[in-house]
Regions:
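Cyclic nucleotide-binding regulatory module and flanking cytosolic helices
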Residues: 1-33, 77, 82-83, 115
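Short active-site oxyanion
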Residues: 7, 99-100
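Cyclic nucleotide-binding regulatory domains
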Residues: 10, 35-97
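Generic anion/oxyanion-binding catalytic loop in active/binding sites
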Residues: 23, 42, 98, 139
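Polybasic "coupling" helices that flank or enter modular domains
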Residues: 114, 118-149
Length: 149
């Protein structure tokens, strides 16, 4: 499958200009391993950028079981979809390793997306990659006929 040979699961590459830009506008958050920093139903009120470390993001099934949605490492954003839509989180997120995040509050995120092509393009690229990752996940699920007439 072509997905196995793609770079979809990798961030866009380390961009020192982007990192400096985010550091200038964000609030640093240092997390120990196994720290939960986002819960289902929580209004996160902003977007996180992973500067160092690794995070895992889980969904909960109807039977209460957890499923790993994705693992993100240095260079990824998290929370951009729920931030744009002003919706609560639909995942549980935790640090897997010592992790450094930068949090951009809701208003700052929207302003930077509007004003900075560098920032906007990075967010759009990563959102597109996450969409393709989810599409791949759907591809591997068994399909159940629904009886379309």
């Amino acid at each position: 499958m072509a997905f196995a040979y793609s770079s979809f699961t990798l961030p866009n590459g380390m961009d020192s200009e982007l990192e400096q830009f985010i550091q200038k506008h964000g609030t640093i958050i240092l997390l120990a391993p196994k720290t939960v920093f986002c819960k289902i139903g929580e209004k996160i009120g902003g977007v996180y950028y992973i500067a160092e470390g690794r995070t895992s993001h889980y969904i909960i099934g109807q039977n209460g079981g957890e499923k790993l949605l994705y693992t993100l490492s240095k260079g990824w954003f998290f929370g951009e979809a729920v931030n744009f839509l002003n919706e609560p989180s639909t995942v549980i997120s935790k640090a897997d390793l010592p992790t450094t995040l930068y949090r951009l509050d809701h208003d700052t995120f929207l302003r930077l997306t509007d004003e900075s092509p560098l920032f906007r393009n990075a967010v759009l690229m990563e959102s597109a990659k996450k969409t393709l990752i989810m599409r791949h996940e759907i591809e591997i699920l068994p399909l159940t006929p629904i009886g379309i007439a």
